[in-house]
Amino acid sequence: QVYEQIKKTLSDDPHVYVAKYKGDRACAISYTFDDGLAEHSTVAAPELEKRGFRGTFWVCGYYTEQGASAKVPRMTWDELREMSKKGHEVSSHSWAHKNAKRLTIEQVKSEIEKNDSAIYANIGIVPRTYCYPYNYKTEEIVSMASKGRVATRTKQISIGGKSTPERFDKWLKDLMKAEDWGVGMTHGINYGYDAFKSPSLFWEHLDKVKSMEDQIW
């Protein structure tokens, strides 16, 4: 919306135009990772860093405080703090990943505020984005969750167990054509929900995106 407002303001000047993305690139991609799995720190983040990329890692404080002892091992606050120092975004996925469909609006608010407080207390940053558990949202929830934030995740494409080279290539082609901002949603890498059949598919995709960094922000 801000982009469109600025574009409209400058539209009368033929010598000036507003680039939609940094470097006037054709499209943009954000890679986001849900639920704070331990391998996001040991596998996903290092693979992104190899290519000069950074990701958004949505965490639930309830899971994080269980760490390696959880049924599905999770990142610790120490690991998340180090990732944040390296430039990754650590942000909120609610406190305990409860389905907002079964909660009152006050309970949803409590889940959000408790997790924001935990992230700030343990990492020293205030989350400026938000990811909805189970991707469930209503206009009221979006309005509430958006207060004090630059964005919440309202659209995404699943990157995981159903990913193929063909699907990755089509996604890139569609983003380029539409000049769109794509948001990837990944859960498991080697284990957990929607884990890859072969993680190498993802790394090869990242290599391709790296080779196109003059076109993709």
Model-derived regions, located:
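C-terminal domain-boundary segment and adjacent tail
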Residues: 3-23, 50, 55, 59-61, ...
